[in-house]
Amino acid sequence: MAKEDYIEMLGEVVENLPNATFKVRLENGHIVHGFISGKMRMHYIRILPGDKVTVQLTPYDLTKARIVFRTK
């Protein structure tokens, strides 16, 4: 899948879940199941509830999202 096939949105982490997954509330109010991207996992970037994040959604499953960036 090419990079431009993803939908990028901003959201806020609502809750930590097991196995480095999170509940993320998007700007439009929807809540999705977010997981950390590989490079964020590799560099030990910590994500806590309340953090603003950028997520990528695939058009095939809009309930799961990849967390690709944590805003300062």
Curated annotation (Swiss-Prot):
GO terms for molecular function: ribosome binding; rRNA binding; translation initiation factor activity. The keyword Membrane does not apply. Gene3D superfamilies: Nucleic acid-binding proteins (2.40.50.140). CDD domains: S1_IF1. It holds the Pfam family eIF-1a. Residues 1-72 form the S1-like domain. Component of the 30S ribosomal translation pre-initiation complex which assembles on the 30S ribosome in the order IF-2 and IF-3, IF-1 and N-formylmethionyl-tRNA(fMet); mRNA recruitment can occur at any time during PIC assembly. One of the essential components for the initiation of protein synthesis. Stabilizes the binding of IF-2 and IF-3 on the 30S subunit to which N-formylmethionyl-tRNA(fMet) subsequently binds. Helps modulate mRNA selection, yielding the 30S pre-initiation complex (PIC). Upon addition of the 50S ribosomal subunit IF-1, IF-2 and IF-3 are released leaving the mature 70S translation initiation complex. This is Translation initiation factor IF-1 1.
